[in-house]
Amino acid sequence: MKILYAYRFQNNEYDIIEFLNKFKELNPDENFKEIDEEYLKKLLTGVIRNQQLIDNLIEKYSKDWPLSRIPMVELELMRIAIYELLFEEEIPISVAIDEAVDLSSIFGVEKAPSFVNGILGSIAVNEVKRE
């Protein structure tokens, strides 16, 4: 989430993978050793490539909340979770939602967990087609 959050402020100077490499270089204290870097790259690239679809779903289910009103932390968490819901079938639906809700309770505003849970739950029920 930190990488996507920071990426939004860089004015398209780098593509997401270049930005990831720069982020790692500038943040040596971050522990990247325990992260599956291939999955991270796939996730970041997938979120960026599918952002329009993902954002359309967020707008569809966040009644009366345009994207511009949603705090950026919550928005990035939902983008990641929605990407996982739609494109990463090996990740259980409940895991994708629970991770986003848990992180929103740590990094988001007070009512973020219920907001994030409501939107992701609606998307999971109405938009996710898994076998």
Swiss-Prot record:
GO terms for molecular function: RNA binding. It holds the Pfam family NusB. GO terms for cellular component: cytosol. Coiled coil: none annotated. GO terms for biological process: DNA-templated transcription termination; transcription antitermination. SUPFAM superfamilies: NusB-like (SSF48013). Keywords: RNA-binding, Transcription, Transcription antitermination, Transcription regulation. InterPro entries: NusB-like_sf (IPR035926), NusB_fam (IPR011605), NusB_RsmB_TIM44 (IPR006027). Belongs to the NusB family. Involved in transcription antitermination. Required for transcription of ribosomal RNA (rRNA) genes. Binds specifically to the boxA antiterminator sequence of the ribosomal RNA (rrn) operons. This is Transcription antitermination protein NusB.
